[in-house]
Design a protein with these regions (language model features):
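C-terminal ends and interior cores of transmembrane alpha-helices
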Residues: 84-99
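Flexible interhelical linker loops that connect adjacent transmembrane helices
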Residues: 177-201
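Glycine-rich segments within core transmembrane alpha-helices of 12-TM secondary carriers
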Residues: 131-156
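Pair of pore-lining "gating" transmembrane helices in MFS-fold secondary transporters
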Residues: 3-51, 198-201
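Central cavity-lining transmembrane alpha-helices of secondary-active solute carriers
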Residues: 49-71
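Symmetry-related core transmembrane helices of the 12-TM Major Facilitator Superfamily/SLC fold
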Residues: 162-184
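Intracellular juxtamembrane helix-capping segments at the cytosolic ends
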Residues: 115-130
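Hydrophobic core of transmembrane alpha-helices in multi-pass small-molecule transporters
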Residues: 101-119
Length: 201
């Protein structure tokens, strides 16, 4: 049985996971519908260029991250940080796209690869939770993330851009805090977390 203080810490950790995952969901939707970050009047070829890079890199990124963590579990957190760094760079580059298709492809590849790693990280955290909490977190991130993205359409483009980048940054902070809480609880290895049921149960 958890003490009241321990239960409060678990609830706070769970809320942080939902918040971080939800923000990442919002950013991912912004990448799926890049009009929220591209300049007004961007051409259809630019959108196709971005989507081409995004789709291929998403597949490669998720596969590479999964294989790497399977072979070297310590890369679980480092890979997530690398993913967030790629995502940030991709968003910044996408916002700077003026008319160069190759820049759009590069931005798409960075966003796709970065999102893949970050998403797999959060999905990995769900496996450390009690089943009911994991299902709630999975549904909650889609609901809250989708709602947040819909609200972006009410904002001017420049404000929406800032909100998207800020959301990615806060999501990264949540990812770092979640990992720190795991290590502080003595659950330093992926194998140990899986065997003991995790720290968010």
């Amino acid at each position: 049985m958890h003490s009241k203080r321990g239960r409060a810490r678990l609830d706070a950790s769970f809320a942080m996971v939902v918040a971080g995952f939800s923000l990442l969901c919002c950013v991912s939707l912004a990448c799926f519908f890049p009009h929220s970050m591209m300049f007004d009047g961007a051409s259809a070829p630019l959108y196709r260029s971005f989507n081409s890079g995004f789709g291929l890199a998403s597949f490669v990124g998720a596969l590479a991250y999964g294989v790497a963590v399977f072979r070297f579990p310590k890369l679980f957190f480092a890979g997530a940080l690398a993913g967030y760094a790629m995502l940030g760079a991709g968003c910044a580059l996408l916002m700077a796209v003026v008319g160069d298709a190759w820049v759009a492809v590069t931005a798409g590849a960075l966003c796709g690869g970065g999102l893949a790693c970050a998403y797999v990280y959060w999905l990995g955290l769900l496996t450390f939770m009690h089943r009911r909490r994991a299902m709630t977190a999975q549904g909650g991130q889609a609901l809250v993330g989708g709602l947040a993205f819909s609200l972006l359409s009410l904002l001017p483009l420049e404000v929406a851009r800032i909100a998207i980048v800020a959301g990615a940054a806060v999501s990264c902070v949540c990812a770092c805090v979640a990992w720190w809480r795991m290590r502080a609880s003595g659950e330093a290895s992926i194998a140990g977390l899986q065997e003991k049921g995790g720290v968010f149960s």
